[in-house]
Amino acid sequence: GLPICGETCVGGTCNTPGCSCSWPVCTRN
């Protein structure tokens, strides 16, 4: 869906469901 999750993942993890870490931001498929 939307490529931007509005979350950063500098620590390496994303808390938003359906989002994965594409450092340094979380992205959605």
Curated annotation (Swiss-Prot):
Record-annotated membrane-spanning stretches: none
**Annotated InterPro entries:** Cyclotide, Cyclotide_moebius_CS, Cyclotide_sf
What is one process in the GO biological process aspect for this record? defense response
Modification(s) after translation: This is a cyclic peptide.
Q: Which cysteines are joined by disulfide bonds?
A: C5-C19, C9-C21, C14-C26
Any keyword Cell membrane? no
Q: Where is this cross-link: Cyclopeptide (Gly-Asn)?
A: G1-N29
- Per UniProt, which keywords does this protein have? Disulfide bond, Knottin, Plant defense
Please state what the annotation says regarding this protein's domains.
The presence of a 'disulfide through disulfide knot' structurally defines this protein as a knottin.
> Function, please?
Probably participates in a plant defense mechanism. Has cytotoxic activity against human lymphoma U-937 GTB and human myeloma RPMI-8226/s cell lines.
- Similarity comment: Belongs to the cyclotide family. Moebius subfamily.
Question: What is the protein name stated in its UniProt record?
Answer: Varv peptide E
Name its species.
Answer: Viola arvensis (European field pansy)
